[in-house]
């Protein structure tokens, strides 16, 4: 099964997450199929905190990829910000 989830990066105490498409069996920060965007929870004012490639997200959801609950929340947040 293919999932859309967060892959952690950054240093200790300064998290940064890539939004990736990966096989469910692969570890959290392991191999992924495609990177769809990023989420920076510690973004300062004027910095971009969330970016998602909507066209690729639509494609992967269309072929059956399941977003994690957190990614689902971030997708809704990005949609509100864009509107």
From Swiss-Prot:
InterPro entries named among the record's database cross-references: Ribosomal_bS16, Ribosomal_bS16_dom_sf
GO cellular component terms given for this protein: cytoplasm; small ribosomal subunit
GO molecular-function term, one example from the UniProt record: structural constituent of ribosome
Gene3D superfamilies xref list: 3.30.1320.10
Keyword entries, A-Z: Ribonucleoprotein, Ribosomal protein
Pfam families for this protein: Ribosomal_S16 (PF00886)
GO biological process terms held by the UniProt record: translation
Top-level taxon of the source organism: Bacteria
Keyword flag Transmembrane: no
NCBIfam families on file: S16 (TIGR00002)
Family (UniProt): Belongs to the bacterial ribosomal protein bS16 family.
Record-given protein name: Small ribosomal subunit protein bS16
Originating organism: Acidovorax ebreus (strain TPSY)
Higher taxonomy: Bacteria, Pseudomonadati, Pseudomonadota, Betaproteobacteria, Burkholderiales
Primary gene name: rpsP
């Amino acid at each position: 099964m293919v999932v859309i989830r967060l892959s952690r990066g950054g240093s200790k105490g300064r998290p940064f997450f890539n939004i990736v498409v990966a096989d469910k069996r692969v570890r959290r920060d392991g191999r992924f199929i495609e990177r769809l965007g990023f989420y920076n929870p510690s973004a300062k004012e004027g910095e971009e905190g969330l970016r998602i490639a909507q066209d690729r997200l639509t494609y992967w959801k269309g072929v059956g990829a399941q977003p994690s609950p957190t990614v689902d929340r971030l997708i809704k947040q990005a949609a509100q910000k864009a509107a």
